[in-house]
């Protein structure tokens, strides 16, 4: 009977209880409990009969104190119905947690006897594990949550050190945090500092960026209380950006990093939370989501790395003891797309591993649709060798982790030597339903069939009892065995009539010492599903307890001679119950204890020492790099010294050296093996000639920070269509694709390692590893004939491509058009996308929805190319459905933050407008500034948009050789544009003279046409160069050097060192470059720029140019050399090379001190005409490549490349030391960029510090360093943090005034566009620069506030009015203070102005204080001064009480004095200025004349 009265009494969903079998002696006691909803999160408290589970539907939690026989609902406080998750503490058998909804949670410290509630002001994070546990102190836990306000969410991490009695905020915006001591074994055997116990590592976003590639790993030993954390020195003590997450594995802590423009990962490992090392995987590439950290040993890490594109197979690696060098164990391991690997270590026994591998791996590598044939393998020597599983003479194959059907381990348990699995014999593994249950009681050496069909199984009483339940369908029986599976009995489950269950879980206590089991299953009852929790107890079936004769000494491992085998220096034995013993062990909660016998040391007890790796044959350890000789040794190369043998005993290995091998005994080594002696100072040169006269193009496939290897790959296509590749930066070249006609090379736009080589037929090749290997692919059509790229690349998915090919273009009479196809596996399979397109592009996923499949296409309207109407359409499902955004566009551009569309107008037909989107779904018309005078908008150039604002060049004059336009800048969503700079030069191809400085945000240079009026009349253009340091809000001329490189003064003069129209530095820009890659700046050389130009009123022809350099981001310049040079940066700016431009030469100039001094070097015996100088795009290499032809006497024909290698130079032969904790202690200093018009050193509202090598230090930077060290003080807002708002324009004094006759944007729109908005502000003419981080100070864009409709209550709470007594004092106190000050001044007038008396002491003088001519005016004046000082507060208070709100930025009144003559002249009737007494925000102090004001603000 179902005891329904229990339901009514308990008020729970517990619907049934206690069906008990009648038999006791010949069958187990079975109790059934029925639940309405599926039980989830079931677990035992270790070493107890206490079991817990959670109702999977209604949030209730249940506990059983008798191993599942009876269940009670946990009804504590408000817990009932509120459980979101239930989990045990993984390392404390007394603790568990109920994580609730709404920030309420509960903890037990006594195995669910009592519960304590704690609250958190955040919801649980859906992105991270909610709880993070300390490995050795169970009271230390971190909780990872998320706090949302509307759509804005901030991740929060909390911590407790007292088991949630108190809870503290650790940090906000932490993406993932972990304790340094994350496992019980971490640090064992090491003398770790005490602070490591408190150490926490957190992955946080970059200082200037939210992109994952800029993530940093910070740590703190003080819970981030007194510091913002120290950046972990992962790579030789240097910080590494792009940290994805951390993970722990027994004795090791790991951090995975990924650089921008690659999907290759670097894995860094530490065993002490201080010293990190990069893990080397024997040449194997590790990619994102392509490795799995497996259950590791106490002395090594085991990692499975994906080895195929489809993630179907991997390679198993095992590390040395410190986790730095990994060796291959077995290839072609079976894995699935979720990262699960068919791998399990046999519990409690060292060295035995079960894996599944793919037998037909060659076929699987060729095609992802081939079905894998899986075979099982076992290792008895810790993965060194593997062999088949044997059931008799047949090979046995078992289902493993990738298709596990039960909780916990798949094959083994703490029961010594007992291993079970579902599988089959034969050539390979079949379906699960075709499998039978097999068992081994000798740890996998021999197997036999236990039961037919697939079963779930579990071990109890240290293996004395084995329980199995049918797992191919429904059942009402269980099977059990008392003799290691030799024979089996069945027991019926006391379920209601005709009820059978499908087994979901079969489990017992974690140590497998109990005679009690729990089975969870479900059964269908009409349309409902019923759930049962079944307790199975064997305790009463066998009364006898085992004694000594019932046990055997069982060896855990046997060698090939069936003798006990050694591992880690000992043999392992267990005292195990004999299979046929008629007894139970009955030692509940006592884990089996192994016994060890020591062995003599063999080769297997040693590993490679630090800085050594296994030789190719695996028999010896060879140096991984040049060895370091002991101090005082190796005075001569032929000397010898005593050093490491290359081996060391594996830490923890207990072998006996006496009488065994001693591979770690020091040996005598020759000094020639040691680190090379200091370089002799030579620069190496390698010249290569080609038959072609010139190169058509070249590309670098550059390694990133997380890439393995040391190659510097260059690919060149010559003027004769020949393809050459060099892996060592042009020292040696190899021709590739000799038999093919490659017509174009398309490097992947987003991944450095990838390039495609295309032909006109549609056949092609690609490389994924920077030219190390090439693979063929076949496109569905030949490339399109629209002179557009055939390939479009996905920003995040390396293998996703769109191919735009030509159809019906072979002269067959059809209508030639382009058709787009897509692939998600690099062309192995192509799928139709759209017909009659011009081009299609993937859209970057970040901030633009959750779909990776967003594609934008330009398609001819009605699929009719003759209409010339291009539609902009998009889709998120490969155009199963599509959305039309615009019907008649000219083009569109996808940028990092915006999608910008040029839309054809209807009247007139050749006009254009602009549409903008930030999410790829919703477009808005761009509001262009009315003060940009454009008769017809005919051309736009979309410029860089990495600073949360888009820059557009809008053509004003489109006549050939007279082109120029306006540079306009958007707000943060790209829709509202303001004029940034007028008359910016462009050429006939649409390129503009505008360039942003690399490595430093907000600095840009542009060339303007200085004689616009004359150009409109047909005159030639004259140019000036302008620079901005606040992202286009203000522009100035370049300050010229005081003297030239020869110490002579220039023929013009500045005003106080400031440039004037008649005397400034002007540089040749983008439109004059042969190669647009030759930029002023470098991402690696922060703050340095080089250009060619002249000092004077205008830019002169390039033939008369000299070369100039700046080291402070353009604030000051100096002449580097007379004449025009090509330049290139190397080693992040520690090497700068100059080569004459357009002049034959044998020599080059180089500088090792940022251009302060130069040395000449001859690189050729014959003069050469150098066409270009190049290096890797990041400018981190010490190699350069010259491209040119010999032209002097003795010349050789053809193109020549010259590799210039500075790595052997003495001054660049030692790597610089960068200590993240003390960044200025060694070879680096911290450089702070500044704004030229800001005395406080602030730039974009903060002070940033960048690592820069000290120029005087003789060392090299090496791989790309993380230049940005920190963001220091956040500055108060000043005028430099604002730009003119829409329909406002800058005046000569720096203020912003409304354009006559135009209205500002409707400020109330914020209320409709943002549902969370409480208030709107009246327009002031100013808006914040999107890039600024300033806080407080001058809020020029927020002066007078008004409530949004229906938000008056929230507005009132934010800005409470003064009422009653508050209002009274606000009025009376200022007046009283004024009177008091006036009276005081009157009383003390005699002492004012330091009056000097010349012997007369009498009073009554004309100017005596008692004179009515003095006393009355003094009192009046003093009172006016005091009242004038206090009245702004009074007026502000009264105004607020009337409903508005005025934020007074300074101590001035609402109507301010004029700051200059220019401001007085410019003020309009509707303009209100805001000026602070201490800092004139809207103008310049004491400008000499209006011209200087113009120059300062860029209005020329």
Swiss-Prot record:
Primary location class: Golgi
Keywords per UniProt: Glycoprotein, Golgi apparatus, Membrane, Protein transport, Receptor, Repeat, Signal, Transmembrane, Transmembrane helix, Transport
InterPro entries associated with the record: Sialidase_sf, Sortilin_C, Sortilin_N, VPS10, VPS10-sortilin, WD40/YVTN_repeat-like_dom_sf
Any single biological process term in GO: protein targeting to vacuole
Recorded name of the encoding gene: VPS10
Pfam families: Sortilin-Vps10, Sortilin_C
Localization in the cell: Golgi apparatus, trans-Golgi network membrane; Prevacuolar compartment membrane
UniProt topology in membrane: Multi-pass membrane protein
Entry similarity comment: Belongs to the VPS10-related sortilin family.
Signal peptide: 1-22
Segments passing through the bilayer: 1365-1385, 1413-1433
Cytoplasmic side: 1386-1412
Protein name listed in UniProt: Vacuolar protein sorting/targeting protein 10
Region annotation (Disordered) ranges: 1481-1500
BNR repeat feature ranges: 378-387, 438-449, 480-490, 724-734, 821-831, 1108-1118, 1150-1159
Glycosylation sites recorded in the entry for this protein: 298, 322, 810, 973
GO cellular component entries: cytosol; Golgi apparatus; membrane
Biased composition (Acidic residues): 1481-1494
Task of the protein: Functions as a sorting receptor in the Golgi compartment required for the intracellular sorting and delivery of soluble vacuolar proteins, like carboxypeptidase Y (CPY) and proteinase A. Executes multiple rounds of sorting by cycling between the late Golgi and a prevacuolar endosome-like compartment.
Alphabetized SMART domains for the sequence: VPS10 (SM00602)
Ranges in the topological domain labelled Lumenal: 23-1364, 1434-1500
């Amino acid at each position: 009977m179902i005891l329904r009265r229990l339901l009514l009494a308990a008020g729970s969903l517990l619907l049934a209880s206690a069906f008990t079998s009648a038999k006791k002696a010949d069958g187990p006691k079975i109790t059934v409990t029925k639940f309405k909803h599926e039980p989830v999160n079931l677990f035992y408290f270790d070493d107890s009969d206490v079991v817990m589970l959670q109702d999977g539907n209604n949030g209730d939690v249940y506990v059983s104190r008798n191993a599942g026989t009876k269940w009670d609902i946990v009804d504590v406080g408000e817990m009932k119905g509120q459980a979101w998750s239930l989990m045990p503490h993984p390392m404390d058998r007394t603790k568990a947690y109920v994580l609730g909804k709404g920030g309420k949670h509960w903890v037990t410290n006594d195995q669910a006897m009592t519960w304590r509630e704690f609250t958190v002001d955040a919801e649980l994070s859906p992105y991270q594990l909610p709880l993070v546990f300390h490995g050795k102190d169970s009271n230390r836990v971190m909780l990872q949550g998320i706090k949302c306000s509307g759509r804005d969410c901030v991740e929060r991490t909390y911590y407790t050190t007292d088991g949630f009695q108190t809870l503290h905020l650790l940090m906000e915006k932490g993406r993932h945090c972990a304790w340094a001591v994350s496992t019980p074994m971490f640090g064992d055997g090491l003398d770790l500092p005490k602070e490591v116990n408190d150490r926490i590592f957190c992955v946080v976003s970059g200082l200037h960026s939210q992109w994952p590639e800029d993530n940093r790993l910070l740590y703190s030993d003080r819970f981030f209380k007194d510091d913002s954390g120290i950046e972990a020195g992962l790579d030789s003590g240097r910080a590494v950006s792009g940290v994805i997450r951390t993970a722990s594995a027994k004795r090791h802590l790991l951090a995975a990093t990924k650089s921008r423009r690659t999907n290759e990962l670097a894995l860094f490992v530490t065993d002490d939370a201080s010293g990190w090392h990069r893990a080397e995987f024997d040449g194997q590439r590790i990619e994102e989501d392509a490795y799995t950290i497996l259950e590791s040993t106490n002395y090594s890490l085991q990692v499975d790395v994906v080895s195929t594109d489809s993630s179907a197979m991997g390679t198993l690696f095992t590390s040395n003891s410190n986790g730095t060098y990994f060796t291959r164990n077995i290839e072609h391991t079976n894995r699935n797309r979720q990262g699960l690997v068919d791998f399990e270590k046999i519990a409690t026994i060292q060295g035995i591993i079960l894996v599944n591998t793919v037998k037909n791996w060659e076929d699987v590598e060729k095609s992802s649709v081939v079905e894998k044939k899986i075979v099982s393998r076992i290792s008895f020597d810790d993965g060194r060798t593997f062999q088949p599983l044997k059931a008799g003479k047949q090979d046995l194959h078992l289902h493993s982790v990738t298709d596990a059907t039960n909780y916990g381990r798949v094959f083994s348990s703490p029961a010594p030597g007992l291993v079970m699995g579902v599988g089959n014999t034969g050539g390979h593994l079949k379906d699960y339903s075709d499998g039978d249950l097999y068992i081994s009681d000798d740890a996998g050496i021999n197997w036999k069939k236990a039961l037919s069909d697939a079963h779930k199984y579990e071990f109890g009483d240290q293996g004395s009892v084995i329980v199995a339940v049918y797992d191919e369908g429904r059942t009402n029986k269980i099977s059990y065995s008392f003799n290691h599976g030799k024979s089996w009995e069945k027991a019926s489950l006391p379920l209601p009539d005709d009820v059978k269950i499908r087994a979901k879980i079969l489990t017992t206590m974690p140590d497998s010492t109990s005679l009690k089991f729990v089975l969870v299953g479900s059964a269908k009852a009409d349309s409902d599903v019923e759930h049962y929790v079944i307790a199975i107890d064997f305790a009463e079936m066998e009364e006898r307890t085992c004694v000594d004769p019932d046990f055997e000494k069982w060896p855990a491992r046997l060698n090939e001679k069936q003798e006990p085998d050694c591992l880690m220096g000992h043999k392992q034995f267990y005292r195990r119950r004999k299979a046929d013993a008629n007894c139970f062990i009955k030692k509940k909660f006592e884990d089996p204890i192994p016994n060890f016998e020591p062995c003599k040391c063999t080769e297997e007890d040693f590993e490679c020492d630090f800085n050594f790796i296994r030789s190719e044959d695996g028999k010896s350890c060879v140096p991984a790099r040049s060895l370091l000789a002991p101090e005082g040794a190796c005075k001569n190369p032929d000397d010898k010294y005593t050093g490491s043998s290359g081996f060391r005993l594996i830490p923890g290995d207990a072998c006996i050296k006496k009488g065994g091998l001693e591979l770690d005994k020091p040996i005598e080594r020759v000094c020639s093996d040691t680190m090379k002696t200091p370089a002799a100072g030579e620069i190496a040169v390698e010249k290569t000639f080609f038959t072609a006269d010139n190169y058509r193009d070249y590309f670098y496939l550059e390694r990133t920070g997380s890439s393995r290897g040391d190659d510097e790959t260059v690919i060149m296509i010559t003027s004769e269509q020949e393809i050459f590749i060099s892996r060592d930066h042009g020292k040696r070249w190899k021709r590739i694709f000799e038999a093919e006609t490659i017509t174009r090379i398309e490097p992947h736009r987003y991944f450095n390692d990838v390039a495609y080589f295309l032909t006109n037929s549609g056949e092609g090749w690609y490389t994924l590893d920077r030219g190390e290997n090439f693979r063929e692919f076949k496109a569905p059509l030949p490339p399109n004939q629209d002179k557009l790229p055939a390939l479009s690349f996905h920003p995040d998915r390396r293998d996703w491509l769109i191919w735009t090919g030509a159809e019906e273009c072979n002269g067959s009479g059809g209508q030639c058009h382009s058709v787009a196809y897509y692939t998600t596996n690099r062309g192995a399979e192509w799928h139709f996308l759209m017909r009659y397109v011009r081009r299609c592009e993937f859209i970057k996923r970040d901030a633009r929805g959750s779909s990776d499949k967003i594609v934008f296409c330009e398609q001819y309207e009605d699929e009719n190319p003759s209409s010339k109407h291009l539609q902009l359409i998009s889709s998120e499902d490969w155009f199963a459905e599509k959305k039309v955004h615009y019907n008649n566009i000219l083009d569109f551009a996808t940028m990092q933050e915006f999608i910008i569309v040029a839309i054809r107008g209807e009247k007139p037909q050749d006009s254009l407008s602009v549409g903008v989107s930030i999410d790829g779904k919703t477009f808005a018309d761009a509001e262009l500034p009315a003060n940009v005078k454009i008769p017809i908008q005919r051309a736009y150039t979309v410029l860089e948009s990495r600073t949360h604002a888009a820059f557009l060049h809008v053509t004003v004059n489109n006549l050939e050789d007279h082109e120029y336009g306006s540079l306009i800048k958007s707000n943060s969503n790209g829709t509202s544009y303001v004029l940034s700079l007028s008359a910016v030069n462009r050429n006939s191809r649409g390129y503009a003279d505008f360039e942003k400085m690399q490595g430093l945000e907000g600095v840009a240079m542009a060339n303007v046409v200085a004689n616009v009026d004359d150009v409109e009349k047909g005159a030639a253009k004259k140019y000036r160069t302008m620079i901005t340091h606040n992202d286009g809000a203000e522009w100035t001329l370049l300050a010229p050097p005081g003297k030239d490189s020869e110490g002579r003064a220039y023929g013009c003069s500045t005003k106080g060192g400031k440039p004037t129209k008649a005397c400034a530095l002007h540089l040749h820009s983008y439109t004059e470059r042969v190669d647009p890659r030759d930029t002023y700046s470098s991402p690696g050389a922060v703050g340095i720029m080089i250009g060619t130009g002249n000092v004077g009123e205008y830019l002169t022809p390039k033939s008369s140019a000299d070369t100039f350099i700046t080291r402070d981001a353009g604030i000051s310049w100096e002449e580097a050399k007379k004449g025009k040079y090509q330049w290139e940066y190397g080693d992040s700016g520690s090497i700068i090379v100059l080569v004459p431009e357009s002049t034959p030469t044998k020599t080059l100039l180089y500088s090792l001190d940022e251009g302060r001094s130069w040395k000449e070097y001859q690189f050729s015996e014959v003069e050469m005409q150098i066409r270009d100088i190049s290096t890797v795009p990041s400018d981190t290499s010490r190699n350069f490549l010259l491209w040119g032809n010999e032209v002097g006497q003795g010349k050789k024909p053809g193109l020549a490349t010259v590799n210039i290698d500075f790595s052997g130079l003495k001054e660049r032969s030692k790597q610089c030391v960068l200590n993240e904790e003390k960044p200025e202690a060694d070879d680096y200093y911290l450089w702070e960029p500044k704004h030229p018009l800001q005395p406080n050193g602030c730039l974009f509202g903060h002070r940033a510090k960048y690592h820069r090598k000290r120029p005087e230090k003789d060392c090299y930077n090496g791989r790309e360093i993380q230049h940005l060290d920190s963001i220091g003080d956040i500055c108060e807002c000043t005028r430099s943090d604002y730009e003119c708002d829409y329909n406002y324009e800058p005046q000569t004094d720096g203020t912003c005034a409304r354009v006559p006759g135009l209205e500002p944007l409707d400020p109330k729109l914020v209320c409709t566009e943002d549902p969370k908005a409480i208030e709107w502000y009246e327009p002031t003419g100013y808006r914040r620069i999107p890039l600024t981080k300033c806080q407080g100070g001058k809020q020029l864009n927020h002066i007078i506030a008004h409530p949004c409709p229906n938000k008056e209550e929230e507005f009132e709470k934010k800005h409470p009015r003064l009422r009653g007594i508050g209002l009274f004092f606000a009025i009376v106190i200022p007046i009283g203070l004024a009177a008091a000050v006036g009276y005081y001044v009157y009383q003390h007038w005699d002492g004012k102005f330091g009056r000097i008396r010349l012997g007369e002491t009498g009073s009554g003088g004309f100017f005596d204080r008692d004179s009515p001519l003095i006393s009355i005016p003094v009192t009046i004046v003093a009172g006016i001064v005091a009242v004038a000082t206090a009245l702004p507060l009074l007026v502000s208070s009264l105004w607020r009480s009337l409903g508005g709100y005025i934020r007074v930025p300074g101590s001035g009144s609402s109507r301010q004095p004029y700051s200059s003559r220019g401001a007085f002249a410019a003020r309009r009737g509707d303009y209100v200025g805001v000026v602070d007494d201490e800092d004139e925000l809207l103008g310049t102090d004491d400008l000499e004349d209006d011209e200087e004001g113009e120059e300062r603000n860029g209005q020329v």
